[in-house]
Protein backbone atom coordinates (compact mmCIF):
# COMPACT_ATOMS: atom_id res chain seq x y z
CA UNK A 1 0.00 0.00 0.00
CA UNK A 2 1.38 3.41 -0.96
CA UNK A 3 1.87 6.22 1.51
CA UNK A 4 -0.96 8.19 -0.14
CA UNK A 5 -3.37 5.23 0.10
CA UNK A 6 -2.43 4.82 3.74
CA UNK A 7 -3.16 8.49 4.34
CA UNK A 8 -6.57 8.14 2.67
CA UNK A 9 -7.52 5.24 4.93
CA UNK A 10 -6.32 7.16 7.98
CA UNK A 11 -8.50 10.10 6.87
CA UNK A 12 -11.57 7.85 6.44
CA UNK A 13 -10.94 6.30 9.83
CA UNK A 14 -10.54 9.70 11.47
CA UNK A 15 -13.63 11.12 9.70
CA UNK A 16 -15.95 8.35 10.89
CA UNK A 17 -14.19 7.52 14.12
CA UNK A 18 -13.02 4.14 12.77
CA UNK A 19 -9.73 2.99 14.26
CA UNK A 20 -9.65 -0.47 12.65
CA UNK A 21 -7.67 -0.29 9.38
CA UNK A 22 -9.63 -3.21 7.81
CA UNK A 23 -12.99 -1.62 8.60
CA UNK A 24 -11.80 1.68 7.18
CA UNK A 25 -10.76 -0.12 3.98
CA UNK A 26 -14.20 -1.72 3.69
CA UNK A 27 -15.97 1.62 4.23
CA UNK A 28 -13.79 3.24 1.60
CA UNK A 29 -14.57 0.44 -0.88
CA UNK A 30 -18.31 0.77 -0.24
CA UNK A 31 -18.13 4.53 -0.77
CA UNK A 32 -16.28 4.12 -4.08
CA UNK A 33 -18.67 1.40 -5.28
CA UNK A 34 -21.66 3.57 -4.37
CA UNK A 35 -20.23 6.52 -6.28
CA UNK A 36 -19.71 4.34 -9.34
CA UNK A 37 -23.15 2.72 -9.14
CA UNK A 38 -25.15 5.86 -8.44
CA UNK A 39 -25.38 7.13 -12.06
CA UNK A 40 -26.60 3.70 -13.22
CA UNK A 41 -29.15 3.46 -10.39
CA UNK A 42 -30.42 6.95 -11.17
CA UNK A 43 -30.86 6.10 -14.89
CA UNK A 44 -32.50 2.80 -13.99
CA UNK A 45 -34.90 4.53 -11.61
CA UNK A 46 -35.86 7.01 -14.33
CA UNK A 47 -36.48 4.08 -16.70
CA UNK A 48 -38.73 2.54 -14.05
CA UNK A 49 -40.70 5.79 -13.73
CA UNK A 50 -41.02 6.10 -17.52
CA UNK A 51 -42.91 2.79 -17.57
CA UNK A 52 -45.96 4.60 -16.22
CA UNK A 53 -48.47 3.44 -13.58
CA UNK A 54 -48.53 -0.25 -12.67
CA UNK A 55 -48.97 -2.49 -9.65
CA UNK A 56 -45.80 -1.00 -8.13
CA UNK A 57 -46.06 2.56 -6.77
CA UNK A 58 -44.02 5.10 -8.71
CA UNK A 59 -41.57 5.88 -5.93
CA UNK A 60 -38.48 4.39 -4.29
CA UNK A 61 -40.58 1.72 -2.59
CA UNK A 62 -42.00 0.59 -5.95
CA UNK A 63 -38.53 0.61 -7.50
CA UNK A 64 -37.19 -1.63 -4.73
CA UNK A 65 -40.13 -4.00 -5.24
CA UNK A 66 -39.39 -4.45 -8.95
CA UNK A 67 -35.66 -4.83 -8.23
CA UNK A 68 -36.38 -7.71 -5.86
CA UNK A 69 -38.82 -9.31 -8.32
CA UNK A 70 -36.18 -9.02 -11.05
CA UNK A 71 -34.24 -11.76 -9.25
CA UNK A 72 -36.89 -14.20 -10.54
CA UNK A 73 -36.79 -12.98 -14.18
CA UNK A 74 -37.26 -15.69 -16.82
CA UNK A 75 -36.36 -15.72 -20.51
CA UNK A 76 -39.32 -14.55 -22.57
CA UNK A 77 -39.04 -15.72 -26.18
CA UNK A 78 -38.14 -19.41 -26.14
CA UNK A 79 -40.69 -21.81 -27.67
CA UNK A 80 -39.82 -25.18 -26.10
CA UNK A 81 -41.62 -24.31 -22.85
CA UNK A 82 -45.00 -24.36 -24.63
CA UNK A 83 -44.71 -27.98 -25.72
CA UNK A 84 -44.23 -29.03 -22.10
CA UNK A 85 -47.64 -27.62 -21.10
CA UNK A 86 -50.66 -29.96 -21.12
CA UNK A 87 -53.01 -27.82 -23.25
CA UNK A 88 -52.64 -28.87 -26.90
CA UNK A 89 -55.63 -27.05 -28.41
CA UNK A 90 -55.48 -23.82 -30.39
CA UNK A 91 -57.90 -20.94 -30.75
CA UNK A 92 -55.71 -18.96 -33.16
CA UNK A 93 -55.24 -19.59 -36.87
CA UNK A 94 -51.74 -19.31 -38.31
CA UNK A 95 -50.68 -15.68 -37.93
CA UNK A 96 -48.74 -13.60 -40.44
CA UNK A 97 -45.27 -12.57 -39.26
CA UNK A 98 -45.23 -9.12 -37.69
CA UNK A 99 -43.42 -6.59 -39.86
CA UNK A 100 -39.95 -5.52 -38.78
CA UNK A 101 -37.89 -6.39 -35.72
CA UNK A 102 -39.35 -6.79 -32.28
CA UNK A 103 -39.67 -3.53 -30.34
CA UNK A 104 -37.29 -2.79 -27.51
CA UNK A 105 -38.94 -3.54 -24.18
CA UNK A 106 -38.15 -2.32 -20.68
CA UNK A 107 -35.56 -4.17 -18.65
CA UNK A 108 -37.83 -4.08 -15.61
CA UNK A 109 -40.50 -6.47 -14.45
CA UNK A 110 -42.95 -3.67 -15.31
CA UNK A 111 -43.22 -4.76 -18.94
CA UNK A 112 -43.54 -1.93 -21.45
CA UNK A 113 -42.53 -1.13 -25.03
CA UNK A 114 -39.87 1.56 -25.56
CA UNK A 115 -40.04 2.15 -29.32
CA UNK A 116 -42.26 1.46 -32.36
CA UNK A 117 -45.11 3.41 -30.77
CA UNK A 118 -48.33 3.77 -32.76
CA UNK A 119 -49.05 7.14 -34.35
CA UNK A 120 -50.71 9.41 -31.79
CA UNK A 121 -53.77 10.05 -34.00
CA UNK A 122 -54.28 6.32 -34.60
CA UNK A 123 -53.75 5.58 -30.91
CA UNK A 124 -56.30 8.14 -29.74
CA UNK A 125 -58.94 7.35 -32.35
CA UNK A 126 -58.62 3.56 -32.65
CA UNK A 127 -56.97 2.25 -29.50
CA UNK A 128 -57.59 4.35 -26.40
CA UNK A 129 -60.49 3.03 -24.30
CA UNK A 130 -61.99 1.20 -27.29
CA UNK A 131 -60.26 -2.12 -28.05
CA UNK A 132 -60.91 -4.03 -24.82
CA UNK A 133 -64.59 -2.90 -24.49
CA UNK A 134 -65.25 -3.62 -28.18
CA UNK A 135 -63.98 -7.19 -28.00
CA UNK A 136 -65.60 -7.88 -24.63
CA UNK A 137 -68.98 -6.71 -25.95
CA UNK A 138 -69.06 -9.82 -28.16
CA UNK A 139 -68.84 -12.11 -25.11
CA UNK A 140 -71.11 -10.61 -22.46
CA UNK A 141 -72.58 -14.03 -21.65
CA UNK A 142 -69.28 -15.21 -20.13
CA UNK A 143 -67.20 -12.08 -19.44
CA UNK A 144 -67.38 -8.64 -17.86
CA UNK A 145 -65.20 -5.54 -17.60
CA UNK A 146 -63.47 -4.45 -14.42
CA UNK A 147 -60.22 -2.88 -13.25
CA UNK A 148 -57.20 -5.11 -13.84
CA UNK A 149 -55.90 -6.98 -10.80
CA UNK A 150 -52.40 -6.87 -12.27
CA UNK A 151 -52.10 -3.25 -13.37
CA UNK A 152 -54.71 -1.39 -11.22
CA UNK A 153 -54.96 1.32 -13.91
CA UNK A 154 -56.25 -0.64 -16.91
CA UNK A 155 -59.73 -1.86 -17.80
CA UNK A 156 -59.64 -5.63 -18.20
CA UNK A 157 -61.78 -8.49 -19.45
CA UNK A 158 -62.68 -11.02 -16.74
CA UNK A 159 -64.46 -14.34 -16.66
CA UNK A 160 -67.84 -13.80 -14.99
CA UNK A 161 -67.95 -14.71 -11.29
CA UNK A 162 -70.98 -16.90 -12.03
CA UNK A 163 -68.89 -19.27 -14.18
CA UNK A 164 -67.55 -22.05 -11.92
CA UNK A 165 -63.82 -22.58 -12.36
CA UNK A 166 -63.58 -26.01 -10.74
CA UNK A 167 -65.55 -27.76 -13.49
CA UNK A 168 -63.33 -28.64 -16.51
CA UNK A 169 -66.43 -28.43 -18.71
CA UNK A 170 -66.53 -24.67 -18.07
CA UNK A 171 -62.85 -23.71 -18.01
CA UNK A 172 -59.62 -25.47 -19.00
CA UNK A 173 -58.46 -28.14 -16.58
CA UNK A 174 -55.41 -26.17 -15.38
CA UNK A 175 -54.87 -23.31 -12.96
CA UNK A 176 -54.51 -20.42 -15.43
CA UNK A 177 -57.91 -18.89 -14.62
CA UNK A 178 -57.26 -19.26 -10.92
CA UNK A 179 -53.78 -17.74 -11.06
CA UNK A 180 -54.96 -14.70 -13.03
CA UNK A 181 -57.93 -14.28 -10.64
CA UNK A 182 -60.23 -14.71 -13.67
CA UNK A 183 -58.53 -11.89 -15.58
CA UNK A 184 -58.32 -12.59 -19.31
CA UNK A 185 -56.80 -9.51 -20.97
CA UNK A 186 -56.02 -5.83 -20.49
CA UNK A 187 -54.47 -3.06 -22.61
CA UNK A 188 -52.12 -0.38 -21.31
CA UNK A 189 -54.07 2.29 -23.18
CA UNK A 190 -53.05 4.91 -20.63
CA UNK A 191 -49.40 4.47 -21.65
CA UNK A 192 -48.00 2.55 -24.65
CA UNK A 193 -51.02 0.54 -25.93
CA UNK A 194 -49.40 -2.84 -25.34
CA UNK A 195 -51.45 -5.66 -23.81
CA UNK A 196 -51.18 -8.54 -21.38
CA UNK A 197 -53.40 -11.57 -21.81
CA UNK A 198 -53.59 -15.32 -21.24
CA UNK A 199 -53.14 -17.62 -24.23
CA UNK A 200 -53.35 -21.37 -24.65
CA UNK A 201 -49.86 -22.84 -24.87
CA UNK A 202 -49.91 -23.44 -28.63
CA UNK A 203 -51.42 -20.00 -29.27
CA UNK A 204 -48.71 -18.43 -27.14
CA UNK A 205 -46.13 -20.32 -29.14
CA UNK A 206 -47.63 -18.98 -32.39
CA UNK A 207 -47.66 -15.39 -31.09
CA UNK A 208 -44.05 -15.48 -29.90
CA UNK A 209 -42.79 -17.31 -32.99
CA UNK A 210 -44.39 -14.80 -35.37
CA UNK A 211 -43.04 -11.79 -33.47
CA UNK A 212 -46.32 -10.42 -32.04
CA UNK A 213 -45.29 -10.68 -28.41
CA UNK A 214 -43.34 -12.40 -25.65
CA UNK A 215 -43.99 -13.90 -22.23
CA UNK A 216 -44.16 -11.88 -19.05
CA UNK A 217 -40.71 -11.88 -17.36
CA UNK A 218 -42.16 -13.57 -14.26
CA UNK A 219 -44.24 -16.11 -16.20
CA UNK A 220 -43.07 -19.67 -15.85
CA UNK A 221 -43.19 -22.79 -13.68
CA UNK A 222 -41.91 -22.35 -10.15
CA UNK A 223 -41.87 -18.54 -10.37
CA UNK A 224 -43.87 -16.29 -7.99
CA UNK A 225 -45.71 -14.53 -10.79
CA UNK A 226 -48.38 -15.01 -13.45
CA UNK A 227 -48.77 -18.34 -15.26
CA UNK A 228 -46.62 -19.31 -18.25
CA UNK A 229 -49.58 -18.48 -20.48
CA UNK A 230 -49.52 -14.77 -19.50
CA UNK A 231 -48.30 -12.99 -22.64
CA UNK A 232 -47.17 -9.46 -23.53
CA UNK A 233 -48.53 -8.25 -26.90
CA UNK A 234 -46.81 -5.42 -28.74
CA UNK A 235 -48.79 -2.27 -29.55
CA UNK A 236 -50.61 -2.36 -32.91
CA UNK A 237 -49.33 0.35 -35.27
CA UNK A 238 -52.02 0.30 -37.95
CA UNK A 239 -55.40 -1.20 -38.87
CA UNK A 240 -53.86 -4.44 -40.15
CA UNK A 241 -51.96 -5.04 -36.92
CA UNK A 242 -55.01 -4.07 -34.86
CA UNK A 243 -57.02 -6.77 -36.66
CA UNK A 244 -54.40 -9.36 -35.66
CA UNK A 245 -54.30 -8.10 -32.07
CA UNK A 246 -58.10 -8.34 -31.80
CA UNK A 247 -57.85 -11.89 -33.15
CA UNK A 248 -55.35 -12.65 -30.37
CA UNK A 249 -57.69 -11.18 -27.73
CA UNK A 250 -60.51 -13.34 -29.12
CA UNK A 251 -58.27 -16.40 -28.80
CA UNK A 252 -57.51 -15.45 -25.21
CA UNK A 253 -61.22 -15.26 -24.41
CA UNK A 254 -61.82 -18.56 -26.19
CA UNK A 255 -59.12 -20.27 -24.16
CA UNK A 256 -60.11 -18.83 -20.78
CA UNK A 257 -63.82 -19.57 -21.28
CA UNK A 258 -63.11 -23.01 -22.79
CA UNK A 259 -65.05 -22.12 -25.93
CA UNK A 260 -65.11 -25.24 -28.15
CA UNK A 261 -65.63 -23.22 -31.34
CA UNK A 262 -62.63 -23.06 -33.60
CA UNK A 263 -60.33 -25.24 -31.51
CA UNK A 264 -57.76 -27.42 -33.23
CA UNK A 265 -56.03 -30.43 -31.73
CA UNK A 266 -52.28 -30.24 -32.42
Swiss-Prot record:
Keyword Cell cycle: no
Keyword tags: Membrane, Oxidoreductase, Transmembrane, Transmembrane helix
InterPro entries the UniProt entry points to: Luciferase, Luciferase_dom
Membrane topology: Single-pass membrane protein
Listed GO MF terms: oxidoreductase activity
GO cellular-component term (any): membrane
Subcellular location(s) of the protein: Membrane
Bilayer-crossing regions: 22-41
UniProt KW NADP keyword: no
Principal location class: membrane
Applied biotechnology: The availability of a complete eukaryotic luciferin biosynthesis pathway provides several applications in biomedicine and bioengineering.
Catalytic activity reported: 3-hydroxyhispidin + O2 = (E)-caffeoylpyruvate + hnu + CO2; 3-hydroxyhispidin + O2 = 4-[(E)-2-(3,4-dihydroxyphenyl)ethenyl]-1,7-dihydroxy-2,3,5-trioxabicyclo[2.2.2]oct-7-en-6-one
EC class of the enzyme, as a word: oxidoreductase
EC number: 1.-.-.-
Family membership noted in the UniProt record: Belongs to the fungal luciferase family.
Function comment: Luciferase; part of the gene cluster that mediates the fungal bioluminescence cycle. Uses the fungal luciferin 3-hydroxyhispidin as a substrate to produce an endoperoxide as a high-energy intermediate with decomposition that yields oxyluciferin (also known as caffeoylpyruvate) and light emission. The fungal bioluminescence cycle begins with the hispidin synthetase that catalyzes the formation of hispidin which is further hydroxylated by the hispidin-3-hydroxylase, yielding the fungal luciferin 3-hydroxyhispidin.
Family matches, as PANTHER family: AMINO ACID PERMEASE_ SLC12A DOMAIN-CONTAINING PROTEIN (PTHR38695:SF1)
Name of the protein this chain belongs to: Luciferase
Organism encoding this protein: Armillaria ostoyae
Taxon lineage: Eukaryota, Fungi, Dikarya, Basidiomycota, Agaricomycotina
